[in-house]
Amino acid sequence: AEGGVRVGFCGRFPGGERGLWNRDDLFSVCIRIPREVKGIGKRFCARPFPSTLILSPPGGGKTTLLRDMVRTLSDGGMRVGLCDERGEIAALSAGSCGFDIGERTDVLSDCPKARAAMILLRCMSPELIAMDEISEPEDAGACRSAAYCGVSLLATAHAADAEELSRRDVYQRLLRGKVFFRAIVIRCA
């Protein structure tokens, strides 16, 4: 959605190719309004930057921290490639970002993360590739491919801690392959 706002719907799934919701089919709506909190990621952004995975349950602030770390690293001189599949990190609209993501950040928005990572890697010469919510095998595969091409990674995943993460199939190859060297766990009170 515009400005990085996320809207979730629940109720009777409409199905079909277009998946249009009828107001009579809705049971609940969740509106998540993003915010920019500058400075929260600074302490995690020392150089050289180790590939880092940010963990928390849904709604824990992963995207907010990711956005600030991207900005901090980019303004600190690092070339960053940002895979913004759902348009919620940079909030790109008409060629302008709705959030400050740094001077040296190239954004690929509304493109599947796995494809965006490979395009950024081949075309934009990043030192760091950042993406939100690794959840599909294709996302994990893109992380592995990028990590073995000499770039650092910054990504998020839904998990309460590293142990919980390690129990999920999609992350096991990432952990075994030592794709990420550090995890930042956001504890929700």
Feature locations, PLM:
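Hydrophobic anchor at the beta1->P-loop junction of P-loop NTPases
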Residues: I54
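The conserved Walker
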Residues: P58-G59
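Conserved lysine of the Walker
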Residues: K62
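Hydrophobic positions on the alpha1 helix immediately C-terminal to the Walker A/P-loop
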Residues: L65, M69
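P-loop NTPase switch/communication element
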Residues: S74-M118
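Conserved P-loop NTPase nucleotide-binding/switch module
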Residues: M124-R182, C188
